[in-house]
Amino acid sequence: MNEFLMSKGIDVVESDLGERILQLMHLAPSHIVMPAIHIKREQISEMMEREMGTEKGNIDPTYLTHAARKNLREKFLHADVAMTGANFAVASTGEIVVCTNEGNADMGTSFPKVHIATMGMEKIVPNLEALGVFTRLLARSGTGQPITSYTSHYRRPPEGQEFHIIIVDNGRSDILAKPDHIRTLNCIRCGECMNTCPVYRRSGGYSYTYFIPGPIGINLGMLRNPEEYSDNVSACSLCLSCSNVCPVKIDLGEQ
């Protein structure tokens, strides 16, 4: 989406620190939760010196984080539109929920007059009771926290602002029609299957050709285009560790 918007002359700024680092370095993410985990702080320091004018050679993570925060705050203040995804959506209330540890969703949606949220249809849970279960599962499996630092609920826009929710199919209905693979849509994007996978842990996210790496990416790539992404299957060791740790019980190794 970023490339399409930029091709239309729209300035796109990632607000998640990891994604922002990758955007400025023109790199793809290597992990679904920690996208820039493969980047050394020395590389980040060099990039921020070039892009933000930070102190040369300063690789202190706190210093670099504060510099990025200051830079992003200016972007937030002058943004015309905020775009977010959604970790979950609640059918009974009509709200979406965005989970972050940086507060970038709150800050990013507070100043612009328009908020556009895009989400896959599999993100919908029936009610707030179910939401409580899934937010705890996501945080525990994704980062080992009881809950993310920020769990933001969006139901209606503030007065004078706009809020649009776009629910995406993009092949999900085709997966629903396949009984052997329907549970793949249970994925909450916690990244636990990547963290436990012996192949991913040794080869990294760039060794996969589908844009989502790891065991869940192998499955999704094969469902999307088996001819194009069949080479990823060789990255499975059949140890089934991914199936054992998956919080939503996707039998990734059996898929």
For the regions a protein language model found, what residue spans apply to each?
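The feature marks the mature, well-folded catalytic cores of soluble enzymes
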Residues: M1-D180
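Phosphate-binding glycine-rich loops and their immediate beta-loop-alpha structural context
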Residues: C187, G191-M194
